[in-house]
Amino acid sequence: GEELGATVRSADITEILISDLLEFVHQYSVPRYKLKNRSGKNNSQQGTDVIAYKYKNEDKTPNDKDELVAAEVKATLSNTEYIPIKNAIIDSRKDEHRLARSVNYCRKRLKELGKIEEVKRFLFKPDNNYRITYVAAGVSSRENVDDAIELDFSGEELEIRKNELIFYVHGKKLMELAHNIYQRCCK
């Protein structure tokens, strides 16, 4: 069959990386259904890149401290530029408009698995208030990070919302890692 192109491999691996960061480091639940609904192998699914959520109460009864996370992920694994951070911050603003559609898509996928209650609580914010956190995640193959990072923002591009986090994941030869992971998965 047709292999995934480098851009799609890069995007997929970085979305998985940010999903893992949210799930295993920050203890969020992260539905992993986005990659299963492509219109083509080299087409990215539209909507919020990564959705994650966390319940305040162990029994998952609604609490206004429950949290829904929308992460915008940008990557340039073949170079060492900081530009993915800037692009993620700018495009993260779009998640305010795409989030409801993306959560509804997750609900449909969870319904197929008999787990509809898992994310249903986050569909109707007016009924049960919760917090929304927007994450702008940039990933590149930079080995070391400078003490000061200048991103050349202008005007309202610079605005970082009160409920926004910025992640920058970097490491040497990340594109090589993405290709290696892809090859191992194909075997």
Model-derived features: where do they sit?
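Charged, structured surface patches that assemble and position nucleic-acid processing machinery
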Residues: V119-K187
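Active-site glycine-rich loop that binds ribose-phosphate moieties when present
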Residues: R32-N37, G47-E58
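A short acidic/basic microdomain associated with nuclease active sites
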Residues: F24-N43
